[in-house]
């Protein structure tokens, strides 16, 4: 394959999404989660964290409790990396999330290459920078404002919960947010608005919300979107207008995966801490 043929990489990613042995028959949602968590460590005040560097290759970040289960996503992408050794892990992880969203009937998300892979743990961000689903609106604002997002963007990014499910042995929570967790839509917002949600304590002591028939769940952080007037306004808008949600989600997810990437006037990412030795992407934990 020609070096720099990102369309070929896109096609290869799309080809591995269907997987009968994984949740709901698709690895798409966990690839979106990988792109999200690889980017969501950014701190605008210090310029640290973000998608550049692929720092989840290193034990310190890989072992952050918020990243439990993402070793699966990283391993799923190893055959792609082997087939296209010229692509950095930082680019591969973010591109995989973008492709997964599109393949699950979501919006097209702008994506640019150029991220680099850091050579060691020096620039691994501190643990604890990712959202905690057990918390409420104040926590969401603390986390997302740190990255540079506003209230509308917070709600739009929460819409990623249209995909995937929680696992008690990973996050402590259990279940899916929507009936079809491998199709991107605005169902998450409709359900927040229209279902009756009851706070329940799981057998592990973790609290989450269930709908009346206990088929679907919401995290306390999800439900806080209904309790905060500014957040609630955007939940209402996105529940009523799928096209508006798709438009806003595309923009904000593109912004998310660019966090930590320093680009020059030509749009190319500035080279920094390149891993020229192709270090082990999955350090022994």
Curated annotation (Swiss-Prot):
Q: Which InterPro entries match?
A: Ccp1-like, Haem_peroxidase, Haem_peroxidase_sf, Peroxidase_I, Peroxidases_AS
Q: Name one GO molecular function term.
A: heme binding
Signal sequence annotation: none
Q: What is this protein called?
A: Putative cytochrome c peroxidase, mitochondrial
- Identify the EC number(s): 1.11.1.5
Its ancestry begins with: Eukaryota, Fungi, Dikarya, Ascomycota, Saccharomycotina
Q: Please give the organism.
A: Yarrowia lipolytica (strain CLIB 122 / E 150)
Any one GO biological process: cellular response to oxidative stress
UniProt subcellular location: Mitochondrion matrix; Mitochondrion intermembrane space
Q: How does it assemble?
A: Forms a one-to-one complex with cytochrome c.
The active site annotation covers 37, 177
Positions contributing to heme b binding: 161
Role, per record: Destroys radicals which are normally produced within the cells and which are toxic to biological systems.
């Amino acid at each position: 394959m020609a070096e720099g043929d990102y369309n070929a990489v896109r096609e290869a990613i799309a080809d591995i999404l269907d997987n009968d042995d994984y949740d709901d028959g698709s690895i798409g949602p966990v690839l979106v989660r990988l792109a999200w968590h690889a980017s969501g460590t950014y701190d605008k005040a210090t310029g640290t964290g973000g998608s550049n560097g692929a720092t989840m290759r290193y034990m310190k970040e890989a072992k952050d409790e918020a990243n439990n289960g993402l070793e699966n996503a990283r391993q799923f992408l190893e055959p792609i990396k082997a087939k296209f050794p010229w692509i950095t892990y930082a680019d591969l992880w973010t591109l995989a999330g973008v492709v997964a969203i599109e393949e699950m009937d979501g919006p097209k998300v702008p994506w640019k290459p150029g991220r680099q892979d850091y050579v060691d743990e020096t620039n691994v961000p501190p643990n604890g920078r990712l959202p905690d689903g057990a918390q409420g609106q104040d926590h969401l604002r603390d986390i997302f404002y740190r990255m540079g997002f506003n209230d509308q963007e917070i709600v739009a990014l929460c819409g990623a919960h249209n995909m995937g499910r929680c696992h008690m042995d990973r996050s402590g929570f259990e279940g899916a947010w929507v009936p079809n967790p491998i199709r991107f839509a605005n169902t998450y917002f409709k359900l927040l608005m229209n279902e009756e949600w009851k706070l329940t304590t799981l057998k592990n002591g973790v609290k989450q919300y269930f709908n009346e028939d206990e088929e679907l769940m919401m995290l306390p952080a999800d439900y806080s979107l209904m309790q905060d007037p500014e957040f609630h306004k955007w939940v209402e808008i996105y529940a009523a207008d799928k096209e508006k949600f798709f438009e806003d989600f595309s923009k904000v997810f593109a912004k998310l995966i660019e966090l930590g990437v320093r680009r020059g006037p030509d749009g190319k990412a500035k080279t920094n801490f390149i891993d020229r030795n192709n270090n082990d992407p999955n350090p022994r934990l």
